[in-house]
């Protein structure tokens, strides 16, 4: 009978990927990124270990949503003080902090525990087309999140 081989920290290699978010759909992109961060696309996936890769997302300011979500989708945060609830629409947040939109979408798709917090640190989001991670020699990953027939 064969034994199940669990990966060890020594034989794990974490790759770096660059994804261009220009014109991509937010939710579809976030699911793909969460899968890569978790390592579910690898044969060495183990639920309790960090087997995923690093992901750099560029052009976060040009991400798209469908329908009326641009005006209706709300992002909430709380300062911790009484009456400290702040609400902001997708449209306003995209102008002010476009990175936060992608980060919150991906964070919601990761586990809600210490492993999820560790995986989230491997996501790097930048509003513009440049990033400071050239030394890691990231591979360009093309993800097509636009369904066939959509504009």
UniProtKB/Swiss-Prot annotation:
Which PROSITE patterns does this UniProt record tie to the protein?
Answer: RIBOSOMAL_L13
Q: Give the originating organism.
A: Synechocystis sp. (strain ATCC 27184 / PCC 6803 / Kazusa)
Q: Does the keyword Transmembrane apply?
A: no
Q: Which Gene Ontology molecular function entries are recorded, alphabetically?
A: mRNA binding; structural constituent of ribosome
GO CC annotations, alphabetized: cytosolic large ribosomal subunit; ribosome
The role this protein plays is: This protein is one of the early assembly proteins of the 50S ribosomal subunit, although it is not seen to bind rRNA by itself. It is important during the early stages of 50S assembly.
Which SUPFAM superfamilies does its entry note? Answer: Ribosomal protein L13
Subunit structure, interactors included:
Part of the 50S ribosomal subunit.
Name the InterPro entries for this protein.
Answer: Ribosomal_uL13, Ribosomal_uL13_bac-type, Ribosomal_uL13_CS, Ribosomal_uL13_sf
Question: Which UniProt key words apply to this protein?
Answer: Ribonucleoprotein, Ribosomal protein
PANTHER family in the cross-refs: LARGE RIBOSOMAL SUBUNIT PROTEIN UL13M, RIBOSOMAL PROTEIN L13
Family annotation (NCBIfam families): rplM_bact
Say which family it is in.
Belongs to the universal ribosomal protein uL13 family.
Example GO BP: translation
UniProt keyword Ribosomal protein present: yes
Stated name of the protein:
Large ribosomal subunit protein uL13
**By which gene is this protein encoded?**
rplM
């Amino acid at each position: 009978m064969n034994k199940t081989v669990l990966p060890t920290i020594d034989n794990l290699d974490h790759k770096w990927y660059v994804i261009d978010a220009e014109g991509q759909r937010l939710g579809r992109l976030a699911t793909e990124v969460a899968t890569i961060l978790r390592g579910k696309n690898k044969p060495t996936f183990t639920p309790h270990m960090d087997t995923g890769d690093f992901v750099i997302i560029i052009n976060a300011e040009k991400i798209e949503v469908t329908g009326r979500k641009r005006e209706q989708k709300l992002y909430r945060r709380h300062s911790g003080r009484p009456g400290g609830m702040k609400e902001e629409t997708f449209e306003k947040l995209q102008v002010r902090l476009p990175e936060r939109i992608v980060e919150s979408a991906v964070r919601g798709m990761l586990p809600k525990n210490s492993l999820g917090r560790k995986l989230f640190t491997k996501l790097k989001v930048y509003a513009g087309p440049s990033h400071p991670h050239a030394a890691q020699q990231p591979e360009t990953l093309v993800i097509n999140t636009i369904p066939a027939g959509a504009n």
